[in-house]
């Protein structure tokens, strides 16, 4: 389960360009739940994912994975618990590879980080159908 509790994030705090992105934001994804994050340009979708993955630090609140606080953990520690698959593989970490090939990295190169647990090759056609909708 992924839980965000009372997340707050401001860009350019204290300046005339200050932007409050999140204030007291709560969000929970139950184990096995499939979630889509949708919204207009600039609404915070990418920032939310970057906060979850640790690319952007939060100003307040905490991020829990299965009840364990991962807020502020180093990237290599957080990567053992959470990762992402890009909607458009051309913008992902290996743009020349298909989505399946990108996911297979978790089975191979990511195995020592514990990333392979989320990839089930037996469900490839199901993943493909979900992602094509």
What are these regions (language model features)?
Residues 2, 22-24:
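Conserved structural motif at the start of ABC-family nucleotide-binding domains
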Residues 24-36:
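Pre-Walker A (P-loop) beta-loop-beta motif of ABC nucleotide-binding domains
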Residues 38-40:
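The feature captures the beta-strand-to-loop junction immediately N-terminal to the Walker
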Residues 53:
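Helix-to-loop junction immediately C-terminal to a conserved catalytic motif
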Residues 61-69:
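Conserved ABC transporter NBD signature motif
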Residues 69-83, 91, 113-121:
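ABC ATPase NBD coupling module
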Residues 96-112:
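Q-loop/switch helix immediately C-terminal to the Walker
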Residues 118-133:
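Conserved ABC ATPase "signature" region
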């Amino acid at each position: 389960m992924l839980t965000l509790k009372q997340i707050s994030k401001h860009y350019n705090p204290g300046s005339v360009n200050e932007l409050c992105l999140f204030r007291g934001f709560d969000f929970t994804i139950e184990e096995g739940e499939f979630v889509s994050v949708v919204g207009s340009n600039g609404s915070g979708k990418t920032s939310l994912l970057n906060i979850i993955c640790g690319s952007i630090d939060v100003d307040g609140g905490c991020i829990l994975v299965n009840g364990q606080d991962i807020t502020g953990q180093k990237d290599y520690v957080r990567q053992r618990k959470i990762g992402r698959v890009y909607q458009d593989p051309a913008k992902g970490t290996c743009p020349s590879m298909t989505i399946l090939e990108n996911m297979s990295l978790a089975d191979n190169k990511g195995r020592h980080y514990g990333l392979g647990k989320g990839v089930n090759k037996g469900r490839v056609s199901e993943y493909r159908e979900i992602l094509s909708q």
